[in-house]
Structures are given as C-alpha cells and as structure tokens.
Amino acid sequence: MTASTHPVGVPAAFWRGMRDSVPFLLVVGPFAALFGVVATEAGLDLAQTMGFSVLVIAGASQLTALQLLTENAPVAIVLASALAVNLRMAMYSASLAPWIGGAPLWQRACAAYLLVDQSYAISLSHYERTPALTMPERMALFLGTIALIAPVWYVATLAGALAGRGIPDAFALDFAVPVTFLALIAPALRTLA
C-alpha cells in the first residue's frame, strides 16, 4: 500500500497517540491528585474516592458532584449538574462519529468510556490531518491517547487521596474546587467571542 492509503499502521498509530498524550500528563496528574485530596477532605474514604475516579473519569464532573455533595445538595441536582458539565462529551462523540462510528460496538463503548478532553483533542487533530487512516489505525490512535492518561489519573487520584488523609483540618482546602474551576474557564475568557 502507498503512504497515502496506509500512512501509519496500527502499532505506530497507538504509539503516536501515546506519545502525543505525554504533555497532557503535566495537567492530568496534579488535577487528579487535587481531586483525591479534596475527596478525602470531603469525607470520602479511599474506596469511594477510587471508585468515583474509575467509574466517572471526568475531573470537572467529579469536582462538581463532590462540591454539591459536600453542600448536601439533593442527589437529583448533583446528577443533573454532573451531566451538564459533561454535555461537551456528547458534542465530542458527535464529531468523532464520522471517524470511528464504523468501529465494532465494543470498541465504540470503550471509546465512550475513555473519552476525555485530551483523547478527543489529540484524536480529532490526527484524524483530520490524516484522513486515510484505517478504522483499526483510528481506534489504535484513540486508545494510545488514553493509554497513559487513564492510569496516571487513577494513580494520581490514589496519591492525592492518601495524602489527603494526612492533611490536618487546620489546612482547609475549601478554596481548591473554586480555584480549579477558575483555572478551567480562564482560557475561555481571553477573548470576548
């Protein structure tokens, strides 16, 4: 096959996705550790904190839910707010559908679970630059993007939860969640558009 019809190969696509995810680890690790600390400070035990991170794997949604839970908000409000924060995932899914929508159902289910901002941004960028990628190459690239991010998210959450147990109550971390959200929205506030 020529380079234009088979530009990468499945293993190379996976490694490319993994390589391109490395810079994001500088953000994912501390953010996950912060979640672990804040979750522990909010009263979640280690199993609850880790279960939350493994099941949800969506930092902004997790912090939103955690903040509302600490304020004794009704469960319906917590769930609705967490879903609202993650509405962007529906848009991400829709824009990835032309690229990976033809993959087997089990692969699409894995992609849906592993869809985070970083895996979306890296994958879509590659798909648009290299439209000749085959479906197996596209899925390999997508899985490569998350191959480091997900484990780092889990390990950093664990480290934060363990560290959070040792933080005295005198060092209240109530400011951590609002500061995190300001950090998330600040880039969007650079322009009036």
Question: Where are each of the predicted segments found?
Answer:
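Hydrophobic core segments of alpha-helical transmembrane domains in multi-pass membrane transport
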Residues: 157, 179-189
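Short hydrophobic alpha-helical membrane-embedded segments
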Residues: 25-30, 55-57, 150-156, 172-177, ...
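Hydrophobic mid-bilayer segments of alpha-helices in multi-pass membrane transport proteins
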Residues: 45, 175-182
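Helix-loop-helix hairpins and the membrane-proximal interhelical loops
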Residues: 1-57, 67-82, 165
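Helix-loop-helix junctions within the multi-pass membrane cores of secondary transporters/permeases
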Residues: 2-6, 79-174
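A generic, lipid-embedded transmembrane alpha helix
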Residues: 57-66, 90
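Membrane-embedded alpha-helical segments in integral membrane proteins
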Residues: 31-40, 63, 151-161
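Membrane-helix interface segments
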Residues: 45-50, 74-77, 102-107, 137-138, ...
